[in-house]
Regions:
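Iron-sulfur (Fe-S) cluster-binding segments and ferredoxin-like electron-carrier domains
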Residues: 52-58, 71-81
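Short cysteine clusters
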Residues: 46, 65-68
Length: 104
C-alpha cells in the first residue's frame, strides 16, 4: 500500500531545476521536477551510492548524478549504461496548489 505525502507547493517546483524536498517520516528527500511538461517525483538519492541527486544536474530529461556522472532518464527511471540501476518514479497528484506523492 502506498503512503501519500504532501511534498511541496506547485509554485516551489521550478522548470529546469532539481530541488529536493524533505518528507516527514522518510529518511530521504523527494525530488520534484518537470520532465518535458510532466511533473515527476523521484527519490532524492542515487541508487548507486546514496549520493544526493539534487547536487547533480538536470540535463535533457535526465538527472546526472554529481558523484559518478550516472544519467537517469526521468521518463523511464533507467540509468544509461547501467541497466541494473533503476530510479523509482513516484505517482504525483496535484491537490489545489499542493504536490502530493505516493511513496511505494
Amino acid at each position: 500500500m502506498a503512503l501519500r505525502v504532501r511534498v511541496c507547493r506547485l509554485a516551489d517546483v521550478v522548470p529546469g531545476e532539481l530541488r529536493a524536498f524533505p518528507v516527514t517520516g522518510v529518511t530521504w528527500p523527494v525530488i520534484v521536477t518537470f520532465a518535458d511538461a510532466e511533473l515527476v517525483a523521484v527519490p532524492g538519492v542515487c541508487p548507486h551510492e546514496d549520493v544526493a541527486l539534487a547536487d547533480g544536474e538536470l540535463r535533457y530529461g535526465e538527472i546526472v548524478c554529481a558523484a559518478h556522472g550516472y544519467r537517469f532518464d526521468l521518463q523511464t527511471g533507467r540509468c544509461a549504461g547501467h541497466p541494473e540501476l533503476q530510479l523509482r518514479r513516484y505517482p504525483v497528484t496535484i491537490v489545489g496548489d499542493e504536490v502530493w506523492v505516493d511513496l511505494l
